Amino acid sequence: LVDMKCLVFKVRGDYARFRKSYTTPSALTYLLIHPVAVRGLIGAVLGINREELYEKTKDIKVAVQVINEIKKDMQSFNLINMKSSDKIFRFPSNVEFLRDVKYRIFIKADENLINKLQSSLVKGEVVFTPYLGASEHIAKLEYEGVYNCEKLPKGQYEIISPVDLDSNTIDFDDSDILLTTDNIPIDNDKNREYTKYKKVIFATGENKI
């Protein structure tokens, strides 16, 4: 077993929108904050600029506990196409939001980054405004602590974070727990394009899989 330091904090917001890039003009959202978005949050707190964000956060390991149940809203907007100089086109678009979101974030990173992030969260100081997928959805952050964590051997465990369906076998004996699945991005490249996805399953609140 390998001992490591992991930092834990909560993030919440009235609304969130983690937009699926392939759903234009109907902008759907992923059902939870994903690792790429978490790295963006960390970058905002520490003041990492967009050009350096990938290199400085790519090695951060992320786990998420979805605390609040999934609540979605859909709103309709009339968008304006400004590409043409002589004609203006309006077209309707449905935009999906998550409402009343709350997550517990677990991260593992190098000691220097952990220390900087801990200091910022304890003081309540951020360099850039952290948001939940879109700049109008401001994130509220709450520091919880830095803890010792360990890498466990393969086996059967109860998990509070999303579980990769392709790499794990799930025991569905407890039928009273509502489980949700989604195919979320877990990695991106320097151009902020998603490069790797995982199909995950997760419970909400204090429920475990």
Summary of predicted features, one role per range:
Residues K20-S84:
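Glycine/small-residue-rich interface belts in oligomeric ring/scaffold proteins
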